[in-house]
Amino acid sequence: MSRADRFIKACRGEQPDCTPVWFMRQAGRYLPEYRAVRAKVSFLTLCKTPELAAEVTLQPVDILGVDAAILFSDILVVPEAMGMHLVLDDAGPQFPEPLRGPADARRLHVPDPARELRFVLDAIRLVRKELAGKVPLIGFCGAPWTLAAYMIEGRTSRSFERAKAALLADEPFAHGLLSRISEALAGYLQAQLDAGADALQIFDSWAGALAPSDYARLGAPYIARVVQGLRRDRKQPVIVFGVETGELLAQLAGTGADVVGVDWRVPLDQARPRVGPAAALQGNLDPVSLFLPPPALEGRVRRVLEEARRAGGGHVFNLGHGILPSTPVENAKLAVELVHRGLPAR
């Protein structure tokens, strides 16, 4: 089996020649090569320049030996394309004019990806050409709740109290906004598939801010809408991932995604009963493990692999969240080697 097949086979619940591995945020600040590119342009310019986005997307494939590339972009380019003013600087992402009610939401439009998000699609085409089938390419978007949280709050937050209060207090506003975002995301993801993406990941970064009962209203149903909005004959797998979602895993599995990402707080063999047998699992090494001495890192990688073996079904090795900016590159390489080496035969 070739390196190109591992990731897709695992997403389908099959057993490849070895466990595939990639890392969320694998194209990022921990790589000197990324920092060299980033030093020349702003973050948003990097996202919107297809040649540069393609360059940094490809870096970890060659440097680390991972089994999938994930497009370098940002989840917030979609709200911007819908009509919001986005500022990305050292203070983090900001919407200076956040949504304050239904009237603001009605001014948002569903963008035409071929026109308003063309830079993303052009980057996908460039990456596909350079990869030449070496490994699959993952496209992505943010989940409706996570995007709505940013759009109402105006910036990142620990609790997103303004967004939660606004959506919980006004059901028509919540439904209208989340429905419009879902429609935009379905079109955006389908355009990524049409441009050549081999798989998709939906990031619900702030899923854990909601109680399970609220997530059942504001979160999972709208991810399901996005998945259902893709072409029914699609063959590319869809991954869904959220942070602090131990109590939400069953809901994530119910969205129709082919793979459920698990953060490091829930062992994979404990996640399996919550997810059920149908979906593959992705995860879930604590990102801090990549700072440990090699023997300790090896022990933690082996533990994840052992938990995945006990869980059964397909498994894509990943971190339980994004790779941290000060991660030693050599340790990230070692983790990839250890995953590929696998566990001794029983």
Please give the residue ranges for each predicted region.
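N-terminal basic, low-complexity leaders that serve as flexible interaction/assembly modules and, when applicable
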Residues: 1-90, 126, 298, 313, ...
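N-terminal/domain-start segments enriched in small and hydrophobic, helix-friendly residues
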Residues: 42-44, 50, 89-91, 95-98, ...
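A short acidic, glycine/proline-enriched capping/turn motif at secondary-structure boundaries
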Residues: 75-78, 93-94, 102, 144-146
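Short glycine/proline- and acidic residue-enriched helix-loop micro-motifs
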Residues: 42, 102-112, 167-174
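A gly/proline- and charged-residue-enriched helix-loop-helix capping module
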Residues: 91-129
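Active-site loop segments of alpha/beta catalytic cores
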Residues: 116-346
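Generic detection of long, well-ordered alpha-helical segments
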Residues: 1, 50-51, 114-117, 175
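A charged helix-plus-loop insertion that forms the helical arch/lid used to bind
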Residues: 87-100, 157-164
